[in-house]
Regions:
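N-terminal targeting signals for export/organelle localization
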Residues: 1-40
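Extracytoplasmic and endomembrane cell-envelope/extracellular-matrix remodeling and assembly machinery
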Residues: 44, 48, 104, 163-165
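Conserved segment of the thioredoxin-like fold in thiol-based oxidoreductases
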Residues: 37, 87-141
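A short beta-strand-turn-helix
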Residues: 41-63
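Loop/turn elements at helix/coil->beta-strand transitions in domains of secreted/extracellular proteins
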Residues: 58-63, 92-94, 116-118, 149
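Conserved redox-active cysteine motifs that mediate thiol-disulfide chemistry
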Residues: 67-84
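Thiol/disulfide oxidoreductase modules built on the thioredoxin-like
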Residues: 116-117, 124-171
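Structural cue for short, hydrophobic secondary-structure segments
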Residues: 64-68, 98
């Protein structure tokens, strides 16, 4: 009986850790979003013009919401994959909305230009206090969401070859 209690306690603790992850409830938010309609958010572009995610998502195109920042080394390393996907699939109905966790506007704009990212970019320039962090449970970057033409989140965290593999299936 004592052994059964120890085993059950171990399963309980493992489940609790898996659900809450390192940053509180963000793991719960992340997992619960796949299969759900996207949540709208509104942030300014590089010119200060406000845009809503609903201006792009749920409008008949596949949309990748890409969370990144100019100061993020892994984001810079991942960006060639994202750019290649954009160039390969944009004319077939694929759009990207970049959401930056930057706080310095000059660095943000410079990275967009130097990293060859020709899609729409949004940021409230609030670093980790970015509104998207709470809405989408972003606890690390790079991160992304793939939204189908009807506005349903179908995947999260597609990096490297995984992004192209999924998009090549969609657009074959």
């Amino acid at each position: 009986m004592k052994r059964l209690s120890v085993v059950l306690m171990a399963f309980f603790l493992a489940g609790a850790i898996a659900c809450y992850g390192a940053d509180g409830n963000y793991a719960d938010i992340q997992q619960s979003l796949v299969g759900q309609k996207f949540l709208d958010l509104e942030e300014p572009d590089v010119n200060g013009v406000e845009h809503k995610l609903s201006d792009y998502a749920g409008k008949g195109k596949w949309v990748l919401v890409d969370f990144w920042a100019s100061w993020c080394g892994p984001c810079k390393a991942e960006m060639p994959n994202v750019t290649a996907a954009y160039k390969k699939y944009h004319d077939k109905g694929f759009e990207i909305v970049g959401v930056s966790f930057d706080r310095e506007k000059g660095n943000w704009i410079r990275a967009i230009r130097e990293w060859d990212m020709p899609w729409i970019h949004l940021s409230d320039l609030k670093y980790w206090d970015n509104a998207a962090r709470e809405v989408y449970g972003v606890d690390a970057i790079p991160d992304n969401l793939l939204i189908d033409p009807d506005g349903i989140i179908v995947a999260r965290g597609l990096r490297g070859a995984a992004l192209d593999a999924v998009l090549s299936e969609i657009f074959k």
